Regions:
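Conserved catalytic cores of very large enzyme subunits
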Residues: 1-125, 146-147, 151-206
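Contiguous, well-ordered alpha-helical segments that form the cores/surfaces of helical PPI scaffolds
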Residues: 129-142, 163
Length: 206
């Protein structure tokens, strides 16, 4: 479903260049996209999925060593890239007849013929694919202790993590023709799962 966020409308206009977006589901927004005529298009677009980075695990494994943190970060991002491209490839394997309402009846903004490639709806950054993350606050806690929000160095470090993710997404988007986005994964169940997995590996960390 889509939910209108009245409170955020003013800020959404600033971020989008004038338009107001409604999120897909709870918290996922599509970027501004225009078709070949220059018309802005929102309806009928889609997200091809998300792969989520467990940031607290990288921070814990680095044991306070930022150089090791960034090295591990780069390694995990490389794995994420492969996983995201796999999601795109699997999506492209679909046939219009697999989901006629979406592909052939206009649910995704255009009516494809039975023999057309579904990638016609995805390419040129019409579709998004998301690099998700969980636990940015906990990364700050590992390196700077609790209540680090007012520490300029801590804030700069956490923002640098997001910036590097965004830089990767921009590079991949230009290389592959899909809109790679940075996405604060809104999944309470995955947060709980990651936490349980990390606790099993590292124990309780005060």
């Amino acid at each position: 479903g889509r939910n209108m966020d009245i409170i955020s409308a003013k800020r959404l206009r600033e971020l989008s260049g004038g338009g107001v977006r409604t999120p897909m589901g709870c918290r996922s927004f599509l970027q501004t996209w225009t078709d070949e005529t220059g018309k802005e298009v929102n309806a009928g677009r889609m997200n091809l999925g998300v792969v989520t980075l467990n940031l607290p695990r990288i921070a814990i494994e680095s044991n306070g060593d930022k150089e090791l943190f960034w090295k591990t970060f780069e390694e995990r991002v490389a794995v994420m890239k492969d996983a995201l491209l796999y999601r795109v490839a699997r999506s492209r394997e679909a046939k219009p007849e697999n989901a006629p309402i979406l592909y052939m009846e206009g649910g995704w903004g255009r009516k494809l013929g039975v023999d057309e490639e579904v990638n016609e709806l995805f390419k040129n950054k019409r579709a998004t694919i998301s690099m998700g993350y969980i636990g940015l606050y906990e990364v700050g806690t590992v390196f700077y202790g609790a209540n680090w929000e007012s520490d300029p160095e801590a804030k700069a470090f956490t923002l640098e993590i997001l910036k590097r993710m965004k830089d990767y997404c921009d590079t991949w988007g230009n290389e592959y023709g899909y809109h790679f986005s940075v996405y604060g994964t809104p999944s309470e169940s995955l947060t709980d799962r990651f936490c349980k997995m990390d606790k099993a590996l590292f124990g309780s960390i005060p």
